[in-house]
Amino acid sequence: VNAGKIELFNNSKWVLTPTNKTDQNSLQILSILFRDMGCDICFENPVIHDQAVANISHLPIYLASCLIETVYCKSNKDLLNLSGKLAATGFSDTSRVGGGNPTLGIDLAKNNTINILKAIKKFKQSISEIEKNFEDRNWDLLEEKLKKAKEWRNHFC
């Protein structure tokens, strides 16, 4: 109670995913409760919800985990030590979700496997394109990709 904050849920996102079997009275009670707590509520089809969270919530956990594994260079202690000293806000921001609770990562994987796999495959395609840009020294295509990402990011953040 001492650590409670009245604004804890202000503007937090809550997605309600009613189905044909959802009790409308219960849905209304939840809606009122979440709105009264200051939440930003939306209603969505459960299938679309699961696809969206696979892309914007679940996939980043596994990508960040891979990033951490990539830079944790056990075979080269000097590189590992210097990387640890140089890692700053960019690395911290990018890797934060990869350092989370492994049990949560497994639960998400088990409960949204198909959508997460689709997101991973799409990511692999995108990173392969970047890899090809590097191999071909095609800085123009790489710049185009980075510009698009900068523009598209505004849709999410």
Residue ranges and their predicted role:
Residues 24-37, 48-75, 84-99, 121, ...:
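Active-site-proximal catalytic alpha-helix in oxidoreductases
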Residues 67-74, 131, 138, 157:
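Long, hydrophobic, amphipathic alpha-helical segments used as structural scaffolds
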Residues 56, 78, 130-131, 156:
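A generic membrane alpha-helix/interface feature
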Residues 80-149:
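Interdomain hinge/lid region at the active-site interface
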Residues 44-45:
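Conserved FAD/dinucleotide-binding core of flavoprotein oxidoreductases
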Residues 1-41, 50-53:
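Rossmann-fold dinucleotide-binding core
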Residues 151-157:
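Long, positively charged, glycine-interspersed low-complexity recognition regions
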